[in-house]
From Swiss-Prot:
The lineage of its organism: Bacteria, Pseudomonadati, Pseudomonadota, Gammaproteobacteria, Chromatiales. One of its GO terms (molecular function) is rRNA binding. Keywords: Ribonucleoprotein, Ribosomal protein, RNA-binding, rRNA-binding. This is Large ribosomal subunit protein uL22. The gene is rplV. GO terms for biological process: translation. This protein binds specifically to 23S rRNA; its binding is stimulated by other ribosomal proteins, e.g. L4, L17, and L20. It is important during the early stages of 50S assembly. It makes multiple contacts with different domains of the 23S rRNA in the assembled 50S subunit and ribosome. The globular domain of the protein is located near the polypeptide exit tunnel on the outside of the subunit, while an extended beta-hairpin is found that lines the wall of the exit tunnel in the center of the 70S ribosome. Belongs to the universal ribosomal protein uL22 family. InterPro entries: Ribosomal_uL22, Ribosomal_uL22_bac/chlpt-type, Ribosomal_uL22_bac/org-type, Ribosomal_uL22_CS, Ribosomal_uL22_sf.
Amino acid sequence: METSAKLKFSRLSPQKARLVADQVRGLPVEKALEILEFSPKKAAAIVRKVLDSAVANAEHNDGADIDALRVARIFVDEGPMLKRIRPRAKGRANRILKRTSHITVTVAEQQ
């Protein structure tokens, strides 16, 4: 049984979020949570919250055994960009793109 959780419009660059997502893909949930807890990256705390939510969904909705869960799929999609302007010399301006992410975590019981 697979259960998932999504976080949309997270103010985090998809490139940075994917670095953390790649570290926990395919691991047992317990080990993945340990890795995320001790990672110094901002993305680790955000991904950890989504993983906790997926585990809670599996336990509450499907009655899954938490000890038997693993991270079946985790992927980060790009969300809409917030466009900001940085003033430059001589009346010019540069555009700054504040990127957002959609993070999806799917957990499943190990076979």
